[in-house]
A protein has these predicted regions:
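Structural motif
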Residues: 41-44, 87-93, 140-144, 199-204
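Short loop/turn segments immediately following the C-termini of beta-strands
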Residues: 37, 81-84, 136-138, 146, ...
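Beta-propeller domains
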Residues: 33-58
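Hydrophobic alpha-helical segments and helix pairs
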Residues: 100-159
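Beta-propeller fold detector
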Residues: 10-13, 53-61, 103-113, 152-163, ...
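Beta-rich, blade/repeat-based domains predominating
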Residues: 14-29, 61-86, 114-132, 138, ...
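A short helix->beta-strand "capping" segment at the edge of beta-propeller domains
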Residues: 1-19
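Short loop/turn segments immediately following beta-strands, especially the blade-tip
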Residues: 46-50, 95-103, 144-151, 202-211
Length: 226
């Protein structure tokens, strides 16, 4: 039998019982932003040292559930927040962490309230400078043109497909359809998972328009993707 070397796993930080940690983003200094979805909180875990675990620092409490953080420029993040269970209202915030200290209060800038259809949010990724893609928790991907000196942030539906739909009653607890997404800049494909359908798909992206260039393509599927 072939022996597979096991990775060493260490506890970096601990959160209280009942916290649902949804996502993370590593800052340039090695510290880690962590979203506690069910508490509407964003935390910063100091860069790990030899003395583990380290103590997390609360960064901000949002009005909605905190879901995802994407870095656009060094230490500048776009944070998505949603009411995923009732109103499906969704917001996008700009969070400038440059020069931030643990004892310093920080106020995220609300740059966008997502328009209809209100679907809630889940994963998000940077497609190119100035363009963010955010996954609706039902069956669509938003394109967000980020703000610049001349224009405010704008959102529109980038892609919608049946393989992104959730299947009510298919799994307990209920699982989303479209979930995570990542853009592979080297190959020009956007990859996404559809949790309730046990699918991993990809879409070719036009390098000039940053729009979908063809229909979604099957990558993998099965119970392990649930």
């Amino acid at each position: 039998m072939v022996e597979i070397p096991q990775a060493k796993i260490e506890v970096v930080a601990e959160f209280p019982k009942g916290y649902f940690l949804e996502n993370l983003a590593v800052r340039p200094d090695g510290s880690i932003l962590v979203s506690a979805m069910n508490k509407r909180e964003l935390w910063c875990v100091p860069a790990p040292t030899q003395n583990l675990p380290v103590k997390p620092v609360l960064v901000h409490i949002f009005d909605l559930m905190v879901l995802n953080m994407v870095e656009d420029g060094e230490d500048v993040f776009y944070v998505t927040a949603s009411d995923v269970y009732t109103t499906r209202e969704s917001h996008l915030y700009r969070l400038d962490m440059r020069g931030w200290l643990a004892e310093k209060k920080i106020e995220p800038e609300l740059i966008l309230v997502f328009p209809e259809p209100k679907v809630g949010l889940n994963g998000s990724c940077l497609l190119a400078p100035g363009v963010l893609l955010a996954a609706g928790i039902t069956a669509l991907i938003w394109r967000v043109d980020l703000p610049n000196a001349a224009e405010s942030a704008r959102a529109r539906v980038w892609l919608k497909h049946d393989n992104m739909l959730n299947r009510p009653g298919g799994k307990k607890p209920e699982q989303p359809g479209l979930n995570g997404l990542r853009f592979a800049a080297r190959t020009g494909f956007l990859y996404y998972t559809s949790t309730s359908q046990n699918l991993m798909m990809r879409v070719p992206v036009n390098p000039n328009t940053l729009e979908p260039e063809d229909m979604p393509q099957f990558v993998a599927g099965g119970s392990l993707l649930g």
